Amino acid sequence: MISPLAYVDPGAKIGKNVTIQPFAYIEKDVEIGDDCIIMAYASVLNGTRMGKGNKIHHHAVLG
């Protein structure tokens, strides 16, 4: 489920069964694997590639 309060760039590749919580920020050149959780206020920046089953905690910045 992707929260309507999260920003996910249309160019990001999001896997199956991914949870993106409110106010998370996902940039364009990002790949998020299946079964990942992006918690509130986390940022995933351009060039980041995440495999399956990762959990990114509140306010974390990747990339």
For the regions a protein language model found, what residue spans apply to each?
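A structural motif detector for beta-strand N-caps
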Residues: 6, 12, 17-20, 24, ...
